[in-house]
Amino acid sequence: MGQVFLLMPVLLVSCFLSHGAAIENQRLFNIAVSRVQHLHLLAQKMFNDFDGTLLPDERRQLNKIFLLDFCNSDSIVSPIDKHETQKSSVLKLLHISFRLIESWEYPSQTLIISNSLMVRNANQISEKLSDLKVGINLLITGNQDGVLSLDDNDSQQLPPYGNYYQNLGGDGNVRRNYELLACFKKDMHKVETYLTVAKCRKSLEANCTL
């Protein structure tokens, strides 16, 4: 009986610490989702502003090219649809999100739009991406059980970004900006989706469908 009473405080402290960790985990998820939502909205606005400077024929042509082309981050293996996203573990979604954000740390510094239009807060984009990367890394650390073994998706290297647009031809500057902004918007939407699903799973909500 004495041993039971001795264990009671230990169990209470353990439950308290576990509850505190869960609250902190949700706080970090809330911050991460809020920040990526802001980045996604910013990416959407930047793309729309640039798209609005194009002539109709130019816009159609660039859209056709983009649909047939690929983004630099497409080499990062990620869920191809909502069903795969729902089946993916929280840790997998966090790792993919981390890699996607990491893939934009350098390209974000070149998000300067042609036709004399410059993103006023281009520097802030890089800062926000870096902050979000740190936050996601904290979430990965807080949500892994034991020693994490990295899969191929985590260890692979992206193609050198400097070579990505080297064969665009004479209209490369316009196409480069179009693809940069379109890819940035697409990837921020991906990260927003993955973090939202992961957050929902950890909050034990009844319905986490997309």
UniProtKB/Swiss-Prot annotation:
It is found in: Secreted. Pfam families: Hormone_1. Residues 1-22 form the signal peptide. GO terms for biological process: animal organ development; calcium ion homeostasis; growth hormone receptor signaling pathway; hyperosmotic salinity response; magnesium ion homeostasis; positive regulation of growth; positive regulation of phagocytosis; positive regulation of receptor signaling pathway via JAK-STAT. One of its GO terms (molecular function) is growth hormone activity. Disulfide bonds join C71-C183, C200-C208. The keyword Signal applies. GO terms for cellular component: extracellular space. InterPro entries: 4_helix_cytokine-like_core (IPR009079), Somatotropin (IPR034975), Somatotropin/Prolactin (IPR001400), Somatotropin_CS (IPR018116). The keyword Signal applies. Zn(2+) binds at H38, E192. Keywords: Disulfide bond, Hormone, Metal-binding, Secreted, Signal, Zinc. Growth hormone plays an important role in growth control and is involved in the regulation of several anabolic processes. Implicated as an osmoregulatory substance important for seawater adaptation. Belongs to the somatotropin/prolactin family. This is Somatotropin. The gene is gh.
